[in-house]
A protein has these predicted regions:
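Generic surface-pattern signal
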Residues: 12-19, 123-131
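Mg2+/Mn2+-dependent nuclease catalytic core
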Residues: 26-130
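Metal-dependent nuclease catalytic cores that hydrolyze phosphodiester bonds in DNA/RNA
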Residues: 1-36
Length: 131
């Protein structure tokens, strides 16, 4: 129900931003980081670049500083897409819809999340969870 509402509210912005769908809800993994997941959308955006797009719900509007964990998540997905599909993500976008129906769009580049940051996050996770 929430996903349907989020999609309907963000549809006008999505239509303007997405030019071609490459893949949706596709499972990917990284042997290097020993993680797996399923991304929301891989597309060609209005700039003609391969873009990883993620949908998020939020109770209220957020600032870019409040969504750094989502930026990091996109970094891991970008790595998994490269390893699994052999595709190089050029842009990363988050569409966030608030309870009131406000749609926020956050833009990142893969280089915004350096590899060293991903390695540190994964190492920290391993230490906490003993994996």
């Amino acid at each position: 129900k929430a996903a349907t509402r989020m999609f309907k509210v963000s549809l006008p912005k999505l239509r303007a931003y997405v030019k071609e769908v490459v893949a949706m809800e596709t499972p990917v993994w990284s042997d290097q980081f020993r993680i797996a997941g399923r991304f929301d959308l891989l597309c060609i955006n209005k700039h003609g670049r391969l873009c990883l797009l993620d949908f998020k719900n939020s109770r209220r509007a957020k600032t870019v500083d409040q969504i750094q964990n989502y930026r990091q998540q996109l970094g891991f997905y970008t790595q998994m897409i490269k390893e699994t599909l052999g595709k190089t993500v050029e842009d990363q976008t988050i569409f966030m819809v608030t309870r009131e129906g406000f749609v926020q769009q956050f833009q990142f580049k893969p280089e915004d999340t350096p590899r060293s940051e991903l390695v540190a996050i994964r190492k920290h996770f391993w230490e906490i969870h003993h994996v």
